[in-house]
């Protein structure tokens, strides 16, 4: 069965709407990756993911470290991203890859039907060039309307996957 992958920053995690986020990044303060909010309604998202997992889907996260970060800062980022994931979505994701900035995320594809949700156009292009579907989310900085559109797109797409599995089993 396929894996449904999510980026974190700007996709599930609201990095860019935190006060002083850029200053925290520049000061290599890893807490910037654990003190923000979710960009999706947590209980609804968790319910949908749990139902799809019952149908055999796996769920994963592929997220980058900060650009040109030191080993020490990279370890802090990993710690804080995992802290946020475990607090916000406990035991929801089957696999989490926190990798060097710019890593080709399509290297983590596990089946021909894997999909990715990401807000980075270049990431989606690489993913699609590898023969897989990427749902590109819009930049949600300073826009509640765009955040709501992205959340709706995620929920709608996951619901479609759920329906296709149910129809195939009939």
What are the functions of these language-model segments?
Residues 13-16, 59, 67-72, 104-108, ...:
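Short catalytic/ligand-binding loop motif for oxyanion handling, primarily in non-cytosolic enzymes
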Residues 3-5, 9-84:
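Alpha-helical substrate-recognition element adjacent to the catalytic core
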